Structure formats: C-alpha cells, structure tokens
Regions:
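Bacterial N-terminal signal peptides
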Residues: 2-18
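Signature of exported/secreted
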Residues: 17-260
Length: 260
C-alpha cells in the first residue's frame, strides 16, 4: 500500500501575511518545508513504510483594499522538491503561475486560501500552501494574547482532507529581525484531521490529531518578518484493504523568510 499524499499534510503554520495598515502592497516570500512520514502497513500484509522529503516554494503576495478588509492574491513563482517528494517534478514545475485568492478582514484575521482554477497542479500544491495566513496585526504589544479557530480543506471530492485547528497566540518579546524592530509572537495549536483519499487498494478514510508550536516576527506596521514552526501528527487510515486501522505518524517543519 502506498503512503498518503504527503502534500495534504503540510499542516504546520506556514506564512503569516502582513495585517492591515502600512504594510507593502506586494511582498515576496520563501517557504522551506520538511516532512517525515511513517506508516505501519503490517496489519494489511504490508511492511513499515517511511518517506522523508523537503520542498522550497517562492511566492508573490499582493494585498488590495476590499470591502471590510483586504483581498489577498498569491502567485506561485516556483516550487521545487527533492528527489523523494511524492508530487512529481513536472507537476511542481507546471504550478508556476498558479494563483490563489484569500481575504483579510479588518481585524487582520485571514480566511481561506483557494486556487482560482482547479487545474491539477494548483490542487496538488494546495496542501503545501494551505497554511499561509496565521493571524497577525499591526500594533502588537508584548503581553497581547488571542485565540483563533479555523477549518481548512485540502483537495477536492473523494481526495480531500479537512483540518480543524485551535491556536493560541502570545506576543512574547520585543526583538530585532532583519534590522527592524519586531514583536516575537509564539503560537501553540492542536488540530483534528478527517478526510478520504483514493488508493490502489480502494478508498481510504483518514482521521487523527496533531499538535504543534512555533514563533514568528511582526513589525510595528504589521509586516510579517519570518518565522518557524514544527508539528507532530498521529493519524490512522482505514478501509477494506486492512482488517484494522493503520497508524501513521508525521513530523513537519516549516520556515519562512522575506525576500529583498
């Protein structure tokens, strides 16, 4: 039995966009991600399977005033993976120019990021880009705390995963990042995961939980200046191909930086 499409499990927080205020209209970002996935298929007559891979994505993000907030336009400049990446290199290459849209409300809270066209390449990399927008805002002060609850879907139809996440944020310290004053925000989150995915041995049901943490930097005007996160997921996959659910563990790490 094949491993799950690991792109759908890039669940850790990725890129935090600038909140409303004086942030630049257009910003370029680099996103580096690593993922290690292990599955025990012995109950289905298989073997223990492991995959580890990394990807690097470059994107251009544009913000425009819109009713009640700002519209978000994300254009993929490039996505590259190492030799173990489960998404084929031609698919990643064809994602160049793919466009995703989202929205920031007036408080700075982001809503869903979805492809403007359901082309194969855009849909397949949606999992890599699904966590672009954790909460950030201008005027953060040390000691500020807040929580956020989100539900995001990667993929479509019978090949999709829904992640429901509860996050707790705290503005922890004043620091310097990229020669700029910034507030370091720490984030802790828990998630529930449910979905389905076709496999060579029939449809599979996916469910489980994850837990993660990280920190990122926000300038006084709300601009995001980079960050890093890590997450561990404990999932189970079930279907007619196995007499009992098969356990899957996933460890993910994400780092984000701005490009000058």
């Amino acid at each position: 039995m094949a491993l799950l499409n690991a792109g759908y499990f890039t669940l850790a927080a990725g890129l935090v966009l600038p909140a409303l205020g004086l942030a630049p209209t257009t910003t370029k970002y680099r996103i580096d991600q690593t993922l290690t996935q292990e599955m025990d298929a012995t109950p289905a007559g298989g073997a223990k399977q492991r995959i580890a891979f990394s990807t690097t994505s470059f994107v251009t993000v544009s913000l425009a005033d819109s009713g009640g907030g700002k519209s978000i336009r994300v254009v993929v400049d490039s996505v590259k993976g190492d030799s173990a990446t489960p998404i084929p290199a031609p698919v990643l290459d064809s994602a160049r120019g793919a466009e995703f849209r989202g929205f920031l409300d007036k408080s700075g809270k982001p809503t869903g990021l979805t492809p403007t066209a359901h082309a194969g390449a855009a849909v397949q990399i949606q999992g890599l880009l699904s966590d672009f927008f954790p909460w950030a805002r201008a005027g953060l002060k040390v000691g500020d705390t807040w929580t956020d609850t989100t539900a995001k879907i990667s993929g479509t139809g019978s090949d999709s995963v829904t992640v429901r996440r509860v996050s707790a944020y705290k503005a922890a310290a004043n620091e310097t990042k990229e020669s700029r004053k910034a507030v370091r925000v720490v984030q802790d989150f828990t998630s529930s995961v449910q979905g389905t995915q076709p496999t060579p041995n029939g449809p599979a049901k996916i469910e489980g939980t994850s837990r993660g943490n990280g920190s990122y930097y926000v300038a006084p005007d709300g601009r995001y200046l980079g960050g890093a996160w890590q997450q561990q997921s404990a999932l189970k996959i079930s279907g007619s191909f196995a007499p009992q659910p098969l356990p899957i563990t996933i460890v993910q790490k994400t780092s984000v930086s701005t490009l000058k």
